[in-house]
Amino acid sequence: MRRPHRLKASRRIPRILLPVVAAALLLLLLPLLPGTPSARGATAPDSPSDCALRGTTGWTDEGHNTDSSVFKRPSGNIKVAMIFVDFPDAVAGDESAADDAAQLTPGADWLWDASYGKAWLDITQHQRWVRMPHNSTDYGYERGMTHEQHEAYVKDAVTAADADVDFSQYDMVYVVPTKKASAISHTPTYVYQPGTEGVVADGSKVKWAVTFGQDMWHWGKKVVAHETGHTFGLPDLYAFDKGDDEHRFVGGWDVMGLIGGAGPQYFAWHSWKLGWTDDSQVVCRASAGSDTVDLTAVEYGSGTKMAVVPTGPTTAYVVESRRKVQGDDGVCSTGALVYKVDSSVKTGEGPIRVMDAKPNATPASNCRPLDDAPYWAGESFTDDAAGVRIEVLSADSDGETVRITKS
């Protein structure tokens, strides 16, 4: 049996110099110091629980509640078995499994940064090609493949690798195909449906799997963050009905939308849902009133991450700050990003929609519509019908100060 290659956690904060770490620690302590509240107003903010919308779709959605019996809790070490498959009609030959893995494994560091060090993908690579029992063209591997078809693919892959892998030791499975299997085109996520037979190996159910396709060579490490996000319960933010623009809902913001977008850091709403952002970092204005909030950019772990104004049982407006650092080092515009959340909307139908501060502007070169959506100091967003107003009062290198009002 060949020794597996394990991707080790560095247990560090990548690419941050010591002075910046010290500054981040100071930011973390600021809310605890007298006279430095993150939210100020005539009335105290409401409890964050008043802004925690409940999901109603029964699957991946924007509800704050996530069914841990269905979806993986994204904290600590997440043990992943990475296996490599070829097919009778697409033989890997001398293709290097290690080279294929190198296209994906940097996703562990990306997710570590995006989760503020709360979640680590502990990937063990079983670098041996195992043969699937059917041709690559026999799996119905196209958009719209059924859950049953996908489960059959996962089952065949797990069965083929079972002699070398003890699947009971892992939380989830990554299946990597030979690049010669062009029929394995895209990368879907498998989530076990409770009450069904599912896939069993070594006395354990395989509850979560990502079956990579040839699009991994286009998206690279961030496809890991997108698809693994589904195992955590996050929905797709791009439009299943492509229309004129399949990324019309959120543009390049959040990796659950456009994987290769300019600002792929998870929305603060997602970070809160996943447990990476604490209640203490959320300002909620559910009752009539106003709050002045000092937002720290979502790319940093400390400080207040978002202000939320609910407008109904399943809807809310959120404002967060974005900066051109870390996972968002390619953003086209920085500032206060405002978006509407609707936890009753299904995946792929626009459960989050970014509000565009500059709807008539022409995007800069290499940027897309909505990439310039953030609001700048002196600008404001208003929804008169919902009684919501969000004003950007000032900005600095760390974030924005905003005033949220609910009438």
Regions found by a protein language model. Give the residues of each.
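Extracellular hydrolytic enzyme modules, especially secreted metalloproteases
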Residues: F167, M172-Y174, K180-D328
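Non-catalytic surface loops within mature trypsin-like serine protease
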Residues: D86-D89, K179, G260, R323, ...
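Short acidic, gly/pro-rich beta-turn/loop elements at beta-sheet edges
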Residues: A92-G93, S185, Y266, D329, ...
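Zn2+-dependent metallopeptidase catalytic core
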Residues: S38-M216, A225, K242, E379, ...
